[in-house]
Amino acid sequence: MARIAGVNIPTNKRVLIALQYIHGIGQKNAAEIIEKVKIPVDRRVNQLSDAEVLQIREVIDRDYLVEGDLRRETGMNIKRLMDLGCYRGLRHRRGLPVRGQRTHTNARTRKGPAKAIAGKKK
């Protein structure tokens, strides 16, 4: 099993698919990495040489923000919004949808389970 960016990559999958197991690398970025390293698209991870794995590691470290660094930067961006006190920051702070979705009836995922309210009794 190859280990790239702190993630164990599955050995029997194609390199294009296996790279997507790394947080921050999707289909487009995986294709770009393969193109930069000049690996055939149909090559599987267990067929890669150590030199090719090293090249992939170097390209990812040099050109892409992945795993812990990406998570940290995303968290810092959200924290910055909350510290500014802007509308998006307030929505994050209150645990409500940030991108303008309605909250009167929906948004249960973001708001959490429904809270019981003492209403009309029969």
Swiss-Prot record:
Signal peptide positions (record): none
The record ties this protein, via Pfam families, to: Ribosomal_S13
What is an example of a GO molecular function annotated in this UniProt entry? rRNA binding
Name the domain of life this protein comes from.
Bacteria
Q: Which SUPFAM superfamilies match?
A: S13-like H2TH domain
Give the keywords, sorted. Ribonucleoprotein, Ribosomal protein, RNA-binding, rRNA-binding, tRNA-binding
Q: Which PANTHER family match?
A: 30S RIBOSOMAL PROTEIN S13/40S RIBOSOMAL PROTEIN S18, SMALL RIBOSOMAL SUBUNIT PROTEIN US13M
Matching entries from NCBIfam families are given as: uS13_bact
Q: What does this protein do?
A: Located at the top of the head of the 30S subunit, it contacts several helices of the 16S rRNA. In the 70S ribosome it contacts the 23S rRNA (bridge B1a) and protein L5 of the 50S subunit (bridge B1b), connecting the 2 subunits; these bridges are implicated in subunit movement. Contacts the tRNAs in the A and P-sites.
Q: How does it assemble?
A: Part of the 30S ribosomal subunit. Forms a loose heterodimer with protein S19. Forms two bridges to the 50S subunit in the 70S ribosome.
**What is the name of this protein?**
Small ribosomal subunit protein uS13
What organism is this sequence from? Rhodopseudomonas palustris (strain HaA2)
> Upper lineage ranks?
Bacteria, Pseudomonadati, Pseudomonadota, Alphaproteobacteria, Hyphomicrobiales
Q: Which gene encodes it?
A: rpsM
